[in-house]
A protein has these predicted regions:
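Weak global preference for isoleucine
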Residues: 3-6, 13, 35, 46, ...
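Residue-level signal for well-ordered alpha-helical segments
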Residues: 5-9, 24, 31, 67, ...
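Long amphipathic alpha-helical segments
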Residues: 63-134
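N-terminal interaction modules that seed assembly of large macromolecular complexes
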Residues: 8-78
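Acidic, proline/glycine-rich low-complexity IDRs
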Residues: 3-9, 114, 129-184
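Charged, amphipathic alpha-helical oligomerization/scaffolding segments
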Residues: 20-27, 46-56, 85, 89-92, ...
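Glutamate identity and glutamate-enriched acidic tracts
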Residues: 20, 33-36, 42, 57, ...
């Protein structure tokens, strides 16, 4: 797959902004993979810090243009089973605080009322995107790495960046809810 760099740079897959994004993406995925058994307060604390950092690093990724019609990651590492394990572990920890109302979703265009969303599904969706990206980087095939950067940036702008912003609002609400703080 051939890619044209919009910003023109030498080895763009090793630029500081890209490597910092890879680092934060790997931290996010590793935390969610080890989430089972953690307390809600710890999960909220870590996610309230990682998600804004991911968002920031996503905005700093260089934009590349794919030169052919294929716009998929070179490899899908996350299976449906992996996704469900992550989502269910988060849902179990979030329990009755998993659901939230969201107005910044595609379905809202066809509704007069907010749409029900879940913290667990949004975090798992972001996990899937970032884990697939990190896996491609781990393989070390430079052409695939370029494609992965292009795709993860494009998907940040179109999908997971909005999910990160939406779920951060819900996480903030749960983390700083006065009733929950009294229980701690």
């Amino acid at each position: 797959m051939y890619i044209r760099n919009i910003m023109d740079s030498d080895k763009p897959i090793y630029q500081r902004d890209v490597l910092e994004f890879v680092t934060v993406a790997v931290q996010y995925c590793a935390f969610l993979e080890g989430i089972e058994g953690k307390q809600r307060s710890e999960v909220l604390d870590i996610m309230s810090k990682l998600i804004p950092l991911l968002y920031l690093k996503g905005t700093l990724l260089p934009r590349y243009e794919l030169l052919d019609d294929e716009e998929a990651m070179p490899a899908d590492y996350v299976t449906e089973e992996n996704y469900d394990i992550i989502r269910c572990n988060i849902a179990s920890i979030m329990a009755d605080r998993d659901d939230y109302l969201d107005v910044f979703v595609e379905d809202m265009k066809y509704s007069d009322t907010p749409v029900l969303a879940t913290i667990s599904e949004n975090l798992a969706d972001i996990y899937q995107e970032l884990k697939n990206f990190a896996y491609v980087y781990k393989l070390g095939v430079e052409a695939d790495m370029m494609t992965a950067v292009a795709v993860v940036k494009m998907n940040f702008e179109d999908e997971w960046g909005q999910k990160a912003a939406n779920v951060l609002r819900a996480i903030h609400e749960v983390k700083y809810d006065e009733d929950d703080l009294r229980e701690i």
